[in-house]
């Protein structure tokens, strides 16, 4: 069945309304899981692009003067419009009788929010494992390129993240083709990371604004760079462009070295190769990608992009510091737990109509996956493995006095000596609770210590009694015990 021009336009209008509603539904859903949030944002970005393309086609259809379209409008506006209506209805019925299995496309179901299916989703292919769905940046490849640059101090990955946009420490003569490849790779990664984590942002427009700012800064005299050689030489400053060879794509620190280079055989061979090459290789496009201004532009854009991603870079540095304290097994367990949590939270909590999904609530009440038997936190979920390791909750401290009860972690073990369970165990042994019995968990040791404590107490009482002296009426001085014995015998 061939569709008419008006039906095609009507279908396009319906598609625009469905796309608009689909985007609104995804913005209202606002899931907590980063993976699910990014998945819906990328879907919204795709729908926006589809909305633009459909709008352009519909606008062209409205503005064009099609003979078939004019004939359809004339038939609809005719006096016998019911005849045309029944004629169209008959064609539709005849088509479906001929093709009874023909599926009708339901736009409401096509653009509805669907839960993540088991397996690898499209959003999983956009991020590396180190990036954790946009929470952190993975700059290990750029770091390897940086430390392999000539005359660059070898620094740690953590320091590299801190001084990512500090390009002034690299001398200008060392900014060769290898350096250009490095900053180009870094710039492309930052652009790609921003597009993947902010799919609804217009990055092209943002970069256009940055380019305008760079042109203004370049004309005004960008720090470390000069856009006009004549002005730089006139002011007595070193002109960066004056010491740059566009043929060999090299910087030179002094004008004497630069002049000597232009007379060298290597430079002359490079000039001959450029002259003998095809015109396409020396086009304006390639010229814009070379020279100090192109290098300064990439550095300027990297600084701007790192400022936009400053929070992510801070989180990345904190994550690197934290991961340095973990073992390989702990890192693997943490990654598995994070991936499991991302998949568990990927089910949307809002349905197409905007109501709460009762099935997701039932899933949350099911048994929590806890293979490591980690303690539960305040939210009812297992605490992170690194926190469990930090507090030593994997160490067992049994106490025989408490009925062989096992305490997990030093903190809980030290605290239990003042709790009711331990005090009750001491009283059952006939021992009066005292701080002296802290860190004593064996019954035999506690009884031995208690016997020794009683003997020492009696000795202290005897010693105290012998230290007290008494004096009779005649002035004789004696101990309190002797005095009491003589007095009892009536000798005093």
From Swiss-Prot:
Residues 345-354 have a biased composition (Polar residues). Residues 276-286 have a biased composition (Low complexity). One of its GO terms (biological process) is mRNA splicing, via spliceosome. Disulfide bonds: none annotated. InterPro entries: Matrin/U1-C_Znf_C2H2 (IPR000690), Matrin/U1-like-C_Znf_C2H2 (IPR003604), RNA_Proc_DNA_Dmg_Regulator (IPR051421), SF3A3_dom (IPR031774), SF3a60/Prp9_C (IPR024598), SF3a60_bindingd (IPR021966), Znf_C2H2_jaz (IPR022755), Znf_C2H2_sf (IPR036236). Pfam families: SF3A3, SF3a60_bindingd, SF3a60_Prp9_C, zf-C2H2_jaz. A zinc finger (Matrin-type) spans 397-428. Residues 355-365 have a biased composition (Acidic residues). Keywords: Cytoplasm, Metal-binding, Nucleus, Phosphoprotein, Zinc, Zinc-finger. Gene3D superfamilies: Classic Zinc Finger. GO terms for cellular component: cytosol; nucleus; spliceosomal complex; U2 snRNP; U2-type prespliceosome. Its main location: nucleus. GO terms for molecular function: RNA binding; zinc ion binding. It is found in: Nucleus; Cytoplasm. Residues 268-291, 337-365 are annotated as: Disordered. SMART domains: ZnF_C2H2, ZnF_U1. Belongs to the SF3A3 family. Involved in mRNA splicing where it associates with cdc5 and the other cwf proteins as part of the spliceosome. This is Pre-mRNA-splicing factor sap61. It comes from Schizosaccharomyces pombe (strain 972 / ATCC 24843).
